[in-house]
Structures are given as C-alpha cells and as structure tokens.
UniProtKB/Swiss-Prot annotation:
This is Probable CoA ligase CCL11. Both substrate-binding domains (SBD1 and SBD2) are involved in the substrate recognition, and are sufficient to confer the substrate specificity. It is found in: Cytoplasm, Cytosol. Its EC number is 6.2.1.-. Signal peptide: none annotated. Keywords: ATP-binding, Cytoplasm, Ligase, Nucleotide-binding. Its main location: cytoplasm. The gene is CCL11. Belongs to the ATP-dependent AMP-binding enzyme family. InterPro entries: AMP-bd_C, AMP-bd_C_sf, AMP-binding_CS, AMP-dep_synth/lig_dom, ANL_N_sf. PROSITE patterns: AMP_BINDING. Residues 329-405 are annotated as: SBD2. It comes from Humulus lupulus. It comes from the Eukaryota. Residues 263-328 are annotated as: SBD1.
C-alpha cells in the first residue's frame, strides 16, 4: 500500500466556509436570519456574503492574508461577516464591543487591521480608538454598519470617517462571477480572536481553517444539534466566534435569531415568539434567567450549552426547573469551541435533581474529535490520581487547538510544549469515572496551610445560599496560613432581610471543610467583570491588597461594610 498517497482529490483543505454554499442549496428558501422584523433566507444570506466578500479586495483593497476587524453586536451583518470576511481570503478579527477605546486601539495596531466594520452604536468607541494611533501610523478603513435605532443618528462629521456603509457593499457586490477564496492549505489562518484577559493582558489567538472546521462539526455532534434548529444568539459572536456556532448553524440549516442586547425579559419573549430550541449562555446568564422577574415555565424545552466559569449546581437546578435543558462544556479561546463536555448517561436521569445538578456541573470527558485529555501534575507532567480529589492541570491534544499567539512565540511555547500537550492553565480533578471537574485557574488556587483550596468550590457553596446573587473568592495573604479564602458577594435584589457576614460564614461552615471557609465576606453592589462577563479576579486581588488586612488581629481596615 506504499504507493497509495494523499492526492488533491482526497486531501483538499478543510474549511467551514463551504457550509454556507451547501445551506443555500439545501435550505435556500428556509429562514436563515431573523432580527426584529427583518428576515433573510439561506439563499439571500449566501448572496449577501458573496457580494460583501467580492468588495473587500476589489473595492476596499484588502489583500489575501491581511486582517479585517468587526466591532458589532449580534446583528445580521455580524453573522454574515463571519463568512464574508474569510471568503475574501482575509483573516477575520471580531472585537468585543464592551472593551474600551485604549484596548481596541492596541488590538487594531497589534493585528495591523486594514479594515474595520463598525456598528452604529460603536462609532464613537472606534473613532476614539483610531485617534490613539501614533502619528504617521497607517489607520484602517472604516465601514459603517447602520441600523434603524431611535435617537441614535450619527453626525455628519462622524459619517465622514467612513468610506461607505455595509449595505452599499451588498448593493454593489458581485455574486455572479465572484468565486470565494478557498484556502491553499487547511492550516491557513481564518480567524484572530483576543483572549478576555481574566488573569493577564489579552493575547491574539490565531486559528486555522482546519481547526475551525473540526471544532464546528465536533460541537454539533457532541451537543446533538438536529437539522434546522432555532438558535437564539445570547452568546456574543465576538466571543470565540460564538463558540463556532456562527458556522455550525449554517451546516444544519438552522435559523439564527439575532438580538442587539438582551435581558431576562427579552430572552423569554424571543423564546416564546420564535419557539427557540437552542442557545448558548455563560453561567452568569443562567443566573440572570433563573432570577428574572419574567421567569416562568417555558412553552417548549430549550437546550442550553453553558461554559466559561463552572456553573454552580444551585444555578443549574433553578434554571432547569423552568424548562431549560442544560449541557455543560469546556473550552477556551485557544480551542474556539467546546472540547470537553459532560456527556450525560441515561441512568443519571433516575437520580435526585440535586445529584443530577452536581454531576452536570462537572466539565466531563473529551468530545469525539479531541484526541486526548488528561489532568497532570504541572511540574512533572505525570497524570494525577483518578480520585476526584488530587488537583492538576488540564492538558489537551487535538485538531481544535490554535496555531498560536500572534507575534508572541514565548507565550505560544509556554502552553504548546515540546511534550506534545497544550497546557491550559486550568486546574481540575479527575473523578474515578473518567470525568474531569475544573477547580480553578492555576493562578487562582488558594494554598492555605499546605492545602489546595478551590475557589470554585467555595463559590459554589456561596451560590447555594438563597440570598446570594454572585460570588467570587480570591486568596488573601496570611502570615500564619500563607493564604486564606476571601469572599466577595452580591445579594439578590428585593431581599427584605439581608444576611450579615456572620450568617454567610456560618452557612459556609455547614457546607465546607474548615480550612475552605472564607475568613472574610465583603458585600458589593456589583463585581468587576471582563467585557465577556467573566469576573475579574485579578482586580479583586488588588482590592484585597488595599484593604489593610492584619493577619495577627484578623481584621481589615475596611471591608466589613458594603463597598
């Protein structure tokens, strides 16, 4: 068999971009996108994407391999650009609309972006970002994504900064003779995403056509997404390209329900109006839904994929009681989508609801396309005991892993190591049944008296308190123990009787080992978060440093009072 070699017919580059062309053929007359009273079919979406792609080089002069950025929420243009930009042979860079101008300016310069599509509500943000470019530094062209938003008209001066509007490209583009640019190699870059920076400065993650193709299909299979689902975009498309579902929903001919902003009322209304079947949501969104005054049983089951921070069992229990069917996955920007999921076993359906929620809060096992997953000692690289207690670092092997960090070979080498593994920086235990459970980021593990304290475990106990809305636990220096847990808590709105710090601590003592109980609980109106909704623990650690703690007296200069 030695003469049987790969040939072009059996080794053409993998890419997710072909999903759109197929959707236009198979589901051409079916609804692809809904936004308020606007809707498109898959045939129309395909045509619109081709027209925009044709203009990116011919009208706007962007060359193959260069970067094009998008600063927009979950509106139809944002969805289309996930196809149109790479169909032009250039690299897509979705930027978070919640970032500040300084950060966006750094990202645009770091990526050397040549063109930025800007949503109407982000115009001032992007103009401020571009104004921060050093003198004589080339600035990207700007294209306006206009929207009929009441009271949000742009000034003539602002409009002068834009070469055209998005719909101008749709009108003048060529969908008849233009052929979308297929990658020469499946290893060619397709997207550039910046990490959220929960523990450090954001890094530019580059993914190939191959990795996106693999993780997209893998995520659909693992979640069991059927043909033609109705998918509600509660997950920002700028967050790792919506975990790959921007391309995945096209692969199965689904309907994308777009929304500019969301809260509990909007989500529940859209679910009922469009008979939504699927959505993705960070645990913070699940918490919002379960505590929403509009929360009531759903008219049909809604499958929800959650990820990011480990969801507390109490939040899962409350959300599922409304009719949401929660699946729990694990991934990072560096893997784009879900690569570890809590594969559900039928026999678990017979367990009490509280036990089901506990099992579902675990991250689980590798997805079908992720080749290997392990939890190892970060120093020796040896697998930890499968006892559900011994903590180690999650390591991965598989096609979903990024090419590397843009212009940062040192950071790339730190996580993609010579031993063949990708080191995630996430700390976990492996249970006897082979399911892993994240306990912390490596930087967030609290070492108290020689014991490893999982901040996630302490937070889960706090979340189970009926008055607690959000909780975050960080390490506080302690002269005797080395470190001790320090808790920040927000309480649910409308509480008639607000618990005291003493009552919260007593509650924790009933739930946790003595060395895991926080020494202090600080009540805050809100917790600092990244633009993707993750709690910024590094900010909380800085707050702790300023609070005048004295371990000998076990007191804080401030802190017992509300902040």
């Amino acid at each position: 068999m030695e003469e049987l070699k790969p040939r072009f017919a059996n080794s053409c580059p993998l890419t997710p971009l072909g999903f759109l062309e197929r959707a236009a053929t198979v589901y051409g007359d079916c609804i692809s996108v809904v936004y308020d009273d606007l809707s498109y079919t898959w045939s129309q979406t395909h045509t619109r994407c081709l027209r925009v792609a044709s203009c990116i080089e011919s009208c706007l002069g962007v060359k193959k391999g260069q970067v094009v950025s998008v600063v927009a929420p979950n509106v139809p243009a944002m969805y289309e650009l996930n196809f149109a930009v790479p169909m032009a042979g250039v690299v897509l860079n979705n930027i978070n609309t919640r970032l500040n101008a300084v950060t966006i300016s750094v990202m645009l310069r770091h990526s050397e972006s040549k063109l930025v599509f800007v949503d109407q509500l982000s115009v001032r943000l992007v103009l401020d970002a571009v104004s921060l470019f050093p003198k004589n530094t080339p600035t990207p062209l700007l294209v306006l994504i206009a929207d009929n938003i009441t009271g949000e008209n742009l000034t003539v001066e602002d409009r002068e900064h834009f070469v055209c509007c998005y719909e101008d490209l749709v009108e003048k583009g060529d969908d008849k003779t233009f052929k979308w640019v297929r990658p020469i190699s499946e290893w060619d870059p397709i997207v550039l995403n910046y990490t959220s920076g929960t523990t450090s400065s954001p890094k530019g993650v580059v993914h190939s056509h191959r990795s996106v193709f693999v993780v997209t299909l893998d995520s659909l299979i693992d979640w069991g997404v059927p043909k033609q689902p109705v998918y509600l975009w509660t997950l920002p498309m700028f967050h790792a390209n919506g975990w790959g579902y921007t391309w995945g929903i096209a692969a199965v001919g689904g309907t994308n329900i777009c929304l500019r902003r969301f809260d509990g009322e909007i989500i529940f209304n859209l679910i009922r109006r469009h008979r939504v079947t699927h959505m993705c949501a960070a645990p913070i969104v699940l918490n919002m839904l379960s505590n929403s005054p509009n929360a009531e049983p759903l008219p049909n089951p809604v499958h929800v994929m959650t990820g990011g921070a480990p969801p507390p069992a109490a939040v899962l229990l409350r959300t599922e009681s409304l009719g949401f069917v929660i699946s729990h996955g694990y991934g990072m920007t560096e893997m784009l989508g879900v690569v570890v999921s809590c594969a559900w076993k039928r026999e678990w359906n017979r367990l009490p609801a509280t036990e089901q929620a506990r099992l579902k809060s675990r991250q689980g096992v590798r997805t079908a396309a992720m080749m290997e997953v392990d939890v190892v000692d970060p120093n020796s690289g040896v697998s930890v005991k499968r006892d559900g207690l011994t903590m180690g670092e999650i390591v991965l092997k598989g096609s979903s892993i990024m090419l590397g960090y843009l212009k940062n070979s040192a950071a790339t080498a730190k996580c993609i190591r010579a031993d063949g593994w990708f080191y995630t920086g996430d700390m976990a235990v492996m249970h006897p049944d082979g399911y892993l459970e994240i306990k912390d980021r490596s930087k967030d593990v609290i070492i108290s008296g020689g014991e490893n304290v999982s901040s996630v475990e302490v937070e889960s106990a706090l979340y189970s308190h009926p008055a607690v809305d959000e909780a975050a636990v960080v390490a506080c220096p302690d002269e005797y123990w080395g470190e001790t847990p320090f808790a920040f808590v927000t309480l649910k709105k409308g509480m008639r009787v607000r618990p005291t710090e003493k009552e919260i601590l007593e509650y924790c003592r009933e739930k946790l080992a003595h060395f895991m109980v926080p020494k202090v609980v600080v009540f805050r109106d809100k917790l600092p978060k990244t633009s993707t909704g993750k709690i910024q623990k590094f900010t909380l650690k800085e707050i702790v440093k300023t609070m005048g703690y004295s371990s000998s007296s076990s007191s804080y200069g401030v802190g017992r009072a509300r902040m």
